[in-house]
Regions:
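Flexible "cap/lid" loop of the alpha/beta hydrolase fold
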Residues: 76-117
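The serine-hydrolase catalytic nucleophile loop
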Residues: 1-7
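Active-site loop/oxyanion-hole signature of alpha/beta-hydrolase fold enzymes
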Residues: 17-66, 225
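Conserved alpha/beta-hydrolase catalytic His-Asp/Glu region
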Residues: 100-101, 114-172
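Short beta-strand/loop motif that positions the catalytic acidic residue
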Residues: 173, 179-181
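Gly/Ala-rich beta-loop-alpha elbow adjacent to hydrolase catalytic centers
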Residues: 67, 71, 75
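Acidic catalytic loop of the alpha/beta-hydrolase fold
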Residues: 183-188
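Catalytic active-site module of serine/aspartate enzymes centered on a nucleophile-bearing elbow/loop
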Residues: 203-237
């Protein structure tokens, strides 16, 4: 749902087949059988395997991959390991090194409403200029999350996904890398994005003014200003 505005944008879909899928445990996708017996933790290997299995099963041709937040981090891993497969990667709010800044235990407790606390934790990541309608639409996605899922996702986002020791090996001549981060993002900050770009030779960086952590959903009209030129450059390459 976070990508619904891109899915119906004719400027984009006239040149690209846009596919957005729900990871297991997320959105309309169910968790696997027996999920109740284990704590959910998204690891780098599981994430990569899930995305690449989806891509290969759909027989994608010359694909461009774009992800936001934890998805942005994942695209950078794929730029390193699947450079020959992807035409380009677009990391929205994605960096190769991040640091936790709040206690994750609050995200899955019996005495706290999980959906509301998850939305509260990310609410400050949305730019103050973003339209109220889309602000609350974005927060609703977090309010609807399953028990412990956001906490499990952050295991990858804040811990297992760090790879600043290997990101300098990304070859942007084979797989161009675009880093786009909002100026109001206090998680994947502009500074962390720039640091990442400095480790990845040839990475193209845009700090999006007036944008927070969820560009494609919190302010889809403003996002066009930043994503259209990137897609045009990919088409022209």
């Amino acid at each position: 749902r976070q990508y619904r505005h891109l899915l119906c944008d004719e400027t984009i879909t006239k040149n690209f087949r846009v596919i957005a899928f729900d990871m297991p445990w997320h959105g309309k996708s169910n968790p696997p059988p027996g999920f109740r017996d284990n704590e959910y933790r998204l690891t780098t290997e599981l994430y990569k395997e899930t995305v690449m299995t989806f891509c290969r099963d759909y027989d994608l041709v010359n694909p461009v991959i774009m992800g936001c937040s934890m998805g942005g981090r994942l695209t950078l891993h794929l730029a390193l390991e699947q450079a020959e497969y992807f035409r380009s990667v677009i990391a929205l709010e994605g960096a190769d090194k991040l640091e936790p800044y709040y206690d994750l235990s609050w995200l899955h407790r019996p005495d706290v409403h999980g959906g509301e606390v998850c939305a509260a934790f990310v609410s400050a990541q949305i730019a103050p200029q973003s339209p109220d309608e889309y602000r609350w639409e974005t927060l609703w996605h977090y309010m609807q999350g399953g028990p412990g899922i956001f906490k499990g996702d952050l295991y990858f986002y804040w811990h297992d996904g760090d790879f600043d020791d290997r990101s300098p090996r990304i070859n942007t001549k084979t797989c161009p890398v675009y880093l786009l981060s909002g100026e109001y993002d206090s998680s994947c900050t502009p500074e962390r994005t720039i640091d990442t770009a400095e480790r990845i030779t040839g990475a193209r960086t845009t700090i999006m003014e007036g944008m927070g952590h969820f560009p494609m959903s919190e302010n889809p009209e403003l996002f066009k200003k930043f994503i259209y030129p990137v897609l045009e450059e990919i088409l022209d390459a």
